[in-house]
From Swiss-Prot:
Residues forming the catalytic site: 20 (nucleophile), 62 (schiff-base intermediate with substrate)
Keyword Hydrolase: yes
Gene Ontology cellular component annotations, sorted alphabetically: cytosol
UniProt keyword Isomerase present: no
Function comment: Involved in phosphonate degradation.
Alphabetical GO biological process terms: DNA repair; organic phosphonate catabolic process
CDD domains membership: HAD_PHN
Catalytic EC class: hydrolase
Origin organism lineage: Bacteria, Pseudomonadati, Pseudomonadota, Gammaproteobacteria, Aeromonadales
InterPro entries: HAD-like_hydrolase_sf, HAD-like_sf, HAD-SF_hydro_IA, HAD_sf, PGP-like_dom2, Phosphonoacetald_hydro
Organism: Aeromonas hydrophila subsp. hydrophila (strain ATCC 7966 / DSM 30187 / BCRC 13018 / CCUG 14551 / JCM 1027 / KCTC 2358 / NCIMB 9240 / NCTC 8049)
Protein name (record): Phosphonoacetaldehyde hydrolase
UniProt binding sites for Mg(2+): 20, 22, 196
GO MF term (any one): phosphoglycolate phosphatase activity
């Protein structure tokens, strides 16, 4: 356990973290969903999409992600040239049903925690912090990922899948708020929503929470841990800058490299809460 101490006032300070999964706690670079989108398009329609295209709608529920991917100008132009019409609802359904078994089969390979994250979460939990979570993955994928992550030591207090709630998923606030209810958090302004993608930042803002974007560990940076570790400081800075800019433009209150860097943010938010500030 890391030696992390944050003075905590249980009546006023941050009470809960609401964490995304891929690119936030597990799967450095968020490769499990993106690589499978590419494979699903190839299998279902022998249609190529690039990894960069697959990353652009990241954070949405996976059916919505496929539909948004089909609306990207580059994908839509190629689709219409190939098939003579925009991607239809039925075609999105077919892609989704192709995607799901591939994702379920692959997700356990991407359950490794992001380096440095678990010791920080253990230390925070030891000080009374509640750990909630939600994902753009549907429940069948989460039912495979959650026990795999537990085998690696990550066990949040609660998790919500993108298809669990009648109201829907991101960018709406509902998954984050379902965590608030389940965890018994006393006020949404005492929660921090942490995510590596824009829809997750919007989710936190819509829920009335503080939001923290992750500029290196997730979708926007888009590198494996091994590739990141081999980069020079200049290379890291060049890739971090647009990721940080995108997350800040989405409204993130803070942007850090990875969840392992969250402690100073919590301390600063506690200071702001004590001064009467709200998200």
């Amino acid at each position: 356990m890391t030696d992390l101490q944050i003075a905590v006032d249980p009546t006023t300070d941050v009470e809960a973290l609401i964490l995304d999964w891929a690119g936030t706690v597990v799967d450095f670079g968020s490769f499990a969903p993106t690589s499978i989108f590419v494979e699903a398009f190839a299998r279902a329609y022998d249609f190529p999409v690039t990894l960069d295209e697959a990353r652009q709608p990241m954070g949405l529920g996976k059916w919505d992600h496929i539909a948004a991917l089909g609306r990207l100008p580059s994908v839509d132009a190629r689709w219409q040239a190939r098939f003579g019409h925009p991607m239809s609802h039925a075609e999105v359904d077919h892609l989704y049903h192709t995607f799901m078994p591939l994702q379920i089969a692959a997700v356990t390979r991407f359950a490794d925690p992001i380096p440095g994250v678990l010791p920080v979460l253990d230390a925070l939990r030891g000080q009374g912090m509640k750990i909630g979570s939600c994902s753009g993955y549907p429940r069948p994928v989460m039912e495979t990922l959650v026990p795999a992550a537990a085998d690696h030591g990550y066990r949040p207090d609660h998790w919500v899948a993108t298809d669990d709630l009648k109201a829907g998923g991101r960018p709406g606030p509902w998954m984050a708020l379902a965590n608030v209810i389940e965890l018994g958090v006393n006020a949404v302004h005492r929660c921090i929503k942490v995510d590596d993608a824009v829809p997750g930042i919007s989710e936190g803002l819509n829920a009335g929470m503080w939001t923290v974007g992750l500029s290196v560990s997730g979708n926007e940076f888009g590198a494996t841990w091994e590739a990141f570790a081999a980069m020079s400081e200049a290379e890291i800075a060049a890739r971090r800058a647009p990721a940080e800019a995108k997350l800040r433009a989405a409204g993130a209150h803070y942007v850090i490299d990875t969840l392992a860097d969250i402690a100073p943010v919590i301390a600063d938010i506690n200071r702001r809460l004590a001064a009467g500030e709200r998200p």
